[in-house]
Curated annotation (Swiss-Prot):
Region (Disordered): 771-792, 814-839
Cell compartments where the protein resides: Cytoplasm; Cell membrane; Cytoplasm, Cytoskeleton
Protein name per Swiss-Prot or TrEMBL: Tetratricopeptide repeat protein 17
Disrupted gene: phenotype observed: Morpholino knockdown of the protein causes curved body, a lack of defined brain structures or necrosis in the developing brain, and eye formation defects at 24 hpf. At 48 hpf, show a reduction in number of ciliated cells within the olfactory organ.
Species assigned in the record: Danio rerio (Zebrafish)
UniProt keyword terms in alphabetical order: Cell membrane, Cilium biogenesis/degradation, Coiled coil, Cytoplasm, Cytoskeleton, Membrane, Repeat, TPR repeat
Amino acid sequence: MTRSFRVEWTDGRKMADDKSNSIGDNSTNKRLWSSSIRGSALIFICALLAEPARATTHWVVTEDGKIQQQVDSPLNLKHPHHLVLFMQQETRVNYLKKLEKQLVAQKIHIEENEDRDTGLEQRHYKEDADCVTAKVPLGDLDLYDGTFISLESKDINPEQFLDLMSALPPDLEKPDCAKLLDLPYSIHAFQHLRGVQEKVNLTSPLLSKDDPIFTSLCLKLGQSVDEVGHRIHQALLKNSSSWVLYNLASFYWRIKNEPRRAVDCVVRALHFSPRQHKDVALVNMANVLHRAHFSADAAILAHAALDLTTDLLTSHYTLGNIYAMLGEYNHSVLCYEQALQAQPGFEQALRRKHAVLCQQKLEQRLEAQHRSLQRTLNELKEYQKQHDHYLRQQEMLDKHKLIQEEQILRNIIHETQMAKEAQLGNHQMCHMGQQKFTLHCPFDLPVRYHRGELFENVHYIQFGEEVSVASSVALVSELSVNESHSPQQSYTVSLGREPAAHWDKETTTTDESRTVLWPRRSDCAQRFPTIPPAYLLPTYYLPPESRNLKALNILLESISPPPSAKMPDCSLKNVVGNRDPLESMSWALEKELRDPQAAEVLLKRSGGRSLEQTGALIAQALEKMSGPRWMMQNEAGLFWRAKGNGTQALVCLRQALHSAPPQHRDLPLVNTANLLLHYGLHSEAHELLQQALQINQSEPHTLLSLVNVHLSQGNLTGALAVFRQALSLSVHCGQCRASLPLMRCLQFYPFLYNLQHQACSSGGACEVEEDSELEDWDTGSSSSGRQEVWDSDAMPVSALEDSLLFEKVVVDSNGSGEASGQDRTREPKAEGGEEEEQDWRLREELIGAFEGALDMNGKTGDLRGIRVLKNDRVMGARGGGPCFGNCEDDEGAEWITFQVKRVKKPKSDASEGWVGEGDVRQTEPTASNSILEISGPTIPSPGPSERWKDYSSLGWPGPEECQRTRRVDLTTVASTWLAVSAKNIDITEHIDFATPLQEPAVEPVCNANLPASMHTLDHLSGVANRGGIHYTGESQLREVLQNLGKDKFPSQSFEQVGTRIAKVLEKNQTSWVLSSMAALYWRVKGQGKRAIDCLRQALNYAPHHMKDVPLISLANIFQNARLWEDALTVARMAVEIAPHFVVNHFTLANVYIAMEEFEKAMHWYESTLKLQPEFGPAKDRLRTIQCYLLSKRDRRAP
């Protein structure tokens, strides 16, 4: 059980001063001072007791009485010595707690008041009395029910107006009122209504068979409707002014459901009707316009009919239908009631009245629900604003908070150091005697060592005696970095001639030179967290002075200042032919991109003149032919580089390339290459630098420019090799010092940048690196014997975390300043199997304290802790391991090694094949291949290590290729899944696929209340707030789950596999494999909280080198939930754990795409293709990004 308490600081010096000042006072003052202090202390204690809620949980007291920091405490700061920042952080923590309580209360209020009545409409229809009476909703009633006022009700017999005795012709005619009479515009005919004016566009729904309009024409008028229409037409030919005939014609056209012709007839009927009979035509027209969806016009006509008619039933009923359709429910009900007064018990009016009342009350209830939902929406928006504010405050909190992984590492290192001191005592450097029978140790302290071939003859250990160690071999180095046996003790490093001795050292102080040449790891991580993009790398200018030609300032001294500030113009001088390959690159240099290094060089070369003054002088020199023209064009190119005008710079440099003498062509070649590289054209720059090296191979500017090309292409190993070659040149280079900070960080801390050596092929020989200046600092091969003293902070060996990153440092153990170098050629390990096995067993005997992974001499092991140090000769190494930078084996050197636990690797003759992108390929036999499974695009396994170097760069496409390239929708999330088979785990050994299922289906359940630890990543907001994330699920992974164990058992349904996982997970909650499978199940189901619960459980129990399996799933969930920062964090962790898996690189690239970090996404798609050059999805996405950037003309190198 732990107890939380608060720690308060006081200023000890102030208290001491107060106490010393009070000594000389009288006893009264002493008593007053003591009483005041006691009173203040009492008040302070009472205040603490009165406010227990303000106590923080930064410090805890463990069960064994130890006081320690909590790993996930927000008060673990990057700068723990900063008291003010600590207090501000505590205030921010308390504020966030209050804000969190407010958010929770606000969310509860929203949920309690949220209207979740989804069955309102159905319940209303069942419970409302009007709805029950109406029997059906208003929408199911025919509100276009046809009505008319019969002529018989006007005491008019239609038979008297028709000739019923005449014979009928074979072709019956139809009454076309518009042709029979050309009616002038008449307001009395309501021709001003919009429905009448737009009669040609009138439409009408189909008539039901029961529509009353079919009874408007009496059967006595004819045997069929067409016969009646013919007789009406004949009658109108004889009497074209009869309002009765026009009304009959309108009845005919209403039956035919042709509203345009009906309007033509009814308008003429209105024109000729007497006032007392106009209601017949008005009701007719109202029905026609109502059915044609001009209900507002129909209402006007129906009201006009009410003023004239005696048939109130028909007019009110018609008007009620019209108002119901218009949504004027109150008017509609009033009209239906008037109709019922005219004819009580009229069922059609009664049902419609109740249906209208039912609909009116339903809409009122729906409007009330809408207002409630709108209020809830506004509250949610306000909640979102508060939540965003909370996240911003959390970001400010995390800004100063120490990264949890780093705090865990510090705790591990501390615990390891404490364990070493407890178990092995204080550590010291011991040496083997010349006869190899004794060990000489300076202190009488316990010594432990492993017996082996080199020291099995040791019979005793001699303590404290002064011995000469110049020719002895350092066997054990376990010197504690926190202790020293004398105040004067310090580490010394044997140094030869200083690296980069000719590189403008006079411009830097000793401290600056020391900081640049011997950087600390923390400085490198802060200054260069990643390899800078091409436009941020230093650029170089190869000056003519390197060929003993006239310098720029000498050429400019002979020229008088020009009267006007002109710019150098190279476009009209010595025009280069159209076949120049550099001409096609000018479009890529259109964007303004200043080169600060070029501006600095030009300022120094021009004697302090301003940029504009220098440009004017160069322009005047070009016009007056002062000096060789190609040299001035070279200087003009430098000017335009400083101005950021790449197009003009390229024009000048092309002219210089065309006119320069062959022996001096490397000057414009190198300068042009630096221009192109600054704009990201690293492939083209590489080609120009290769041409320059053919002319002069000993020019450091050329080599360092080539270093930048390799860096921009991601070839860090190649960059280091060329950098060593440049260091070996004893040539003055005033600009070269700009490359030192980054390159020295790459040399000393290669694993900070994921730098790895490619393994030699089995049949080929490894290239032996030449001796260079780089090794002088660690081998002490120079005869000068100069030494430098390093403090413990700057010494890499004092930082145990550096050893965790597999870095090696060399410390001179004898102080002589001299040591013999050994051949660094890597020997093939074809016949040394027995020695390697003994070598491995010796490493295996070491014990450890924490987890990791290590690959040494082709054997894989689990890293379990750190043990300081064994000399390579003691360990039996033969130089076959990875080597970066300083590779010489010094007999007096100490090496950081690791304690490992051996893991046997399964033997296989060949890896499984993979299918992707429409073709099938069987990979070459290799023991290190891993099979990856992924849903979305199929992710193949990486090929053998010999094939990795086949891919260098995809390059940038041209406009034609972009037009041909199939574009990929980058907003589509490709779900990824790292199968446990990639970790050589057989899933059928964990899940029972053979036993038939008898019981009903169940779902896997993980421990949702698993305590937070250093492994569960609860410091991420997505994990801590997993119950509130918006996760839509990844149903595309269903097939992956169904095919688990497909090699041995047939595919099963999704529910069956979930049940099998649930059965075994219930018995074994500590299996990270089963927890990962359960998380995959919940990813398919779309339940993010349950999936994260299972992934927390998997992360808690998984070994470190297996954690990338749940981390990839977690990254996909965060990306789906749009928690991109969290997704980025866990995806990076997965890549760091297993950088050789394609799926990890591809997932990280996808996260950067979602964040619209296109250049970073391109980098990781490139790294994906380096692992698997034929992987189509990465190629397609990379091409899509490139074409998008090119279309914006805003390209920078990846």
